[in-house]
């Protein structure tokens, strides 16, 4: 049985109770947080441009 799971997650993901051979490939793409020039109204806003975590899990039983 071959299960391929592609789950976008934010934060931590815990995997427990996995049996058999397991190949885990994590591709984390996260851009730097850019701060624009200070705005006189609110002192500038922190903008998180991209925060994406891709988890590819392959189970071979």
UniProtKB/Swiss-Prot annotation:
Please give the subunit comment from the record.
Homodimer.
Q: Give the protein's recorded name.
A: Double gene block protein 1
Q: Which organism is it from?
A: Carnation mottle virus (CarMV)
- What biological function has been recorded for the protein in this entry? Cell-to-cell movement. Displays RNA-binding activity.
Known InterPro entries for this protein? Tombusvirus_movement
Q: Map out region (Disordered) in residue numbers.
A: 1-45
Q: Which UniProt keywords apply?
A: RNA-binding, Transport, Viral movement protein
Q: Where is this region: RNA-binding?
A: 17-35
Q: Where is this chain compositionally biased, Basic and acidic residues type?
A: 28-37
What superkingdom does the record give? Viruses
The answer to whether UniProt assigns keyword Cell division to this entry is no
Tell me which family the UniProt entry assigns to this protein.
Belongs to the carmovirus double gene block protein 1 family.
């Amino acid at each position: 049985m071959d299960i391929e799971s592609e789950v976008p997650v934010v934060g931590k993901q815990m995997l427990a109770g996995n049996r058999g051979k397991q190949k885990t490939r994590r591709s984390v793409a996260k851009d730097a947080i850019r701060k624009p020039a200070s705005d006189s109204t609110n002192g500038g806003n922190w903008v998180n441009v991209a925060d994406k975590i891709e988890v590819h899990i392959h189970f071979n039983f």
